[in-house]
From Swiss-Prot:
Family: Belongs to the L/F-transferase family.
Known function: Functions in the N-end rule pathway of protein degradation where it conjugates Leu, Phe and, less efficiently, Met from aminoacyl-tRNAs to the N-termini of proteins containing an N-terminal arginine or lysine.
Matches recorded under InterPro entries: Acyl_CoA_acyltransferase (IPR016181), Leu/Phe-tRNA_Trfase (IPR004616), Leu/Phe-tRNA_Trfase_C (IPR042203), Leu/Phe-tRNA_Trfase_N (IPR042221)
Class of this enzyme: transferase
Native species: Vibrio cholerae serotype O1 (strain ATCC 39541 / Classical Ogawa 395 / O395)
The protein's name in its UniProt record: Leucyl/phenylalanyl-tRNA--protein transferase
GO cellular-component term (any): cytoplasm
Lineage: Bacteria, Pseudomonadati, Pseudomonadota, Gammaproteobacteria, Vibrionales
GO biological process: protein catabolic process
GO molecular function: leucyl-tRNA--protein transferase activity
Record-listed E.C. numbers: 2.3.2.6
Length: 243
């Protein structure tokens, strides 16, 4: 089967409409261009993100349905709450963004590492611009879990998460949802639904619903301090928002 895709020009940051994305493979929109931070930022502003395998050109996607979390309604499993009360992982924001991005790459098999050197560099540059943020989970002084993504107003576009210890990524998501919602964050984009996200309570929006939400939230700002470097949990206050 022949498919026709737009090739992005390296000279401009223009993308085709997300509504022209293919149904099969779901959401494939364009190829080419580059990974300049400006291009990636322009993509997220339109509900588009890069993802490609080791042997692929740069591919750009806008799938439907879209996996999302409503941070105001997120509820961790009781077992995760009990685990955190016992083990008291520390949780932070923007303490080790480059390390989180690196671990998100390294914890996957080599043939599945879409977070190549170019992608890691691009998100690192976006972090320097204050657009890419991370949540870290620590066991003592060791980084054992976390997530990172791009903030677009009151929408957070989650890119990847990792876990090197029991429940670490679940705790990262739990604390971030609470923190983000307290700062007027409205929606967390998880891109494509999978069994793990579904087990954590993710739901889906159609492309039309997601783009409508994006347009509504991207011009509204979260409260000041949301993405300042800070601690969300320490051994003296590991569960500040118990039932």
């Amino acid at each position: 089967m022949t498919i026709y895709l737009t090739e992005l020009s390296p000279e401009t940051l223009t993308f085709p409409s997300p509504f022209t994305a293919l149904d099969d493979p779901n959401g494939l929109l364009a190829f080419g261009g580059d990974l300049r931070p400006e291009r990636i930022w322009a993509a997220y502003q339109q509900g588009i993100f890069p993802w490609y395998g080791p042997e692929d050109p740069i591919l750009w996607w806008s799938p439907s349905p879209r996996a999302v979390f409503d941070p105001t309604r997120f509820q961790p499993a009781k077992s995760v709450k009990k685990f955190q009360r016992k083990h008291q992982y520390r949780v932070s924001v923007n303490h080790a963004t480059s390390q989180v991005i690196e671990q998100c790459a390294l914890t996957r098999p080599a043939d599945q590492r879409w977070l190549n050197d170019s992608m890691r560099h691009a998100y690192g540059e976006l972090a320097k611009q204050g657009r890419c943020h991370s949540v870290e989970v620590w066991q003592g002084e060791q980084l054992v879990g976390g997530l990172y993504g791009i903030s677009v107003g009151q929408l957070f576009c989650g890119e990847s998460m990792f876990s090197l210890a029991t429940n670490a990524s679940k705790i990262a998501l739990w604390y971030f949802c609470d923190h983000f919602s307290r700062h007027q964050g409205q929606l967390i984009d998880c891109q494509v639904m999978n069994p793990h996200l579904q087990s954590l309570g993710a739901t889906t929006l159609s492309r039309e619903q997601f783009i409508q939400s994006l347009l509504s939230f991207k011009e509204k700002q979260v409260l000041s301090g949301c993405f300042e470097t800070q601690w969300l949990a320490t051994p003296t206050s590991p569960c500040a928002f118990e039932d």
